[in-house]
A protein has these predicted regions:
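Catalytic cores and adjacent flexible loops of soluble metabolic enzymes
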Residues: 1-143
Length: 143
């Protein structure tokens, strides 16, 4: 959990940075900071992502964000402004973390993310036809 945890376990940005550096020293080239329980603030997303992107230019830094309807855009915007180019999402925002103390927290909705990227003129390369089919299938599976 890259941005904290609800368990009272030791957490600091320095601990995260130390583990990221250890993973990079082992040859890992892609790191996604996870906000598994949705506790990250937009400011945290920005500062941590920016620091890692700037200090590890050969490593691809991304985010796996969990959010509520009222804070997803702030978190996504913070990651984009920090320079992230890798983002995890879930169709229809399905899934989440049963350990999250906030029942409204879930995976960041892929459709919202795509709309955000398109509104901000980012080229996504998303196959819209395949996305629509995937959304239809997800709707049938997760009724």
């Amino acid at each position: 959990m890259g941005f904290g945890n609800p368990y009272g376990d030791n957490y600091s940005e320095e601990i995260v940075f130390a583990w990221v550096n250890k993973l990079v020293s082992m040859g890992i080239q892609i790191i996604s900071l996870a906000d598994t329980v949705g506790v990250a603030t937009a400011e945290q997303v920005y500062t941590m992502s920016k620091y890692l992107i700037d200090s590890l230019p050969s490593t691809e830094i991304g985010v796996h964000l969990h959010s509520r309807v009222d804070n997803w855009k702030k978190k996504l915007d913070a990651a984009v402004k920090a320079g992230c180019k890798r983002f995890d999402g879930a169709l229809k925002g399905i899934g989440g973390c049963p350990m999250a103390k906030d029942e409204l927290v879930g995976n960041m909705n892929t459709e919202w993310m795509i709309n955000y990227f398109e509104e901000n003129n980012f080229v996504t390369g998303i196959n819209k036809e395949a996305l629509e089919k995937s959304l239809q299938i997800a709707g049938e599976i997760f009724r």
